[in-house]
Amino acid sequence: MRMIIIAVCALLFGMNTAIADGHDKANAFGFALNVPAEHIADVEEILTSHMKFMQSTHSVTGDASTRLNSYSVIKGPVLVDPTDPSKGTTGAMMYILSEHYETPAGFAKHMQASTGWSDLPRMQEMMMKFGVGAVYPGFHMQSMNR
């Protein structure tokens, strides 16, 4: 029950944040996770579910007004000392997820579609537990593509 309450509050807060104070112009967001080794498999399961959700609800070639321009998840080991990789890794994994939409309408469509995704509560819990940074709402600044 506690998880349901947390998920509903996070969703409502997120939707209000996205449309408050001019943030309805957002067309991107991203977040970073620092995940201890013992939770990596669970996080990757959630991210795999998220990718399937994205593939089933988003288009990179369709209507320009709601088109997803880019979606990526990158991962890499957390270094003991980022200035000296020779010191090794901590065993944790860093993940960075980013999404960029052609227009704010695409971002709004994503927020609406996410309410029907069964793993949304798990994703939100993961972000709260392991999140070390987020850009939400975000605004596409620059890109370089092939």
Language-model features and meaning:
Residues 39-74, 114-123:
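Short amphipathic alpha-helical segments
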Residues 55-96, 131:
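Short, glycine- and small/hydrophobic-rich beta-strand elements in well-ordered beta-sheets
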Residues 41, 102-113:
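Short amphipathic alpha-helices within nucleic acid-binding modules
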Residues 26-34, 96-98:
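Active-site-flanking beta-strand signature of metal-NTP-handling nucleotidyl enzymes
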Residues 15-20:
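Sec/Tat signal peptide C-region and signal peptidase I cleavage site
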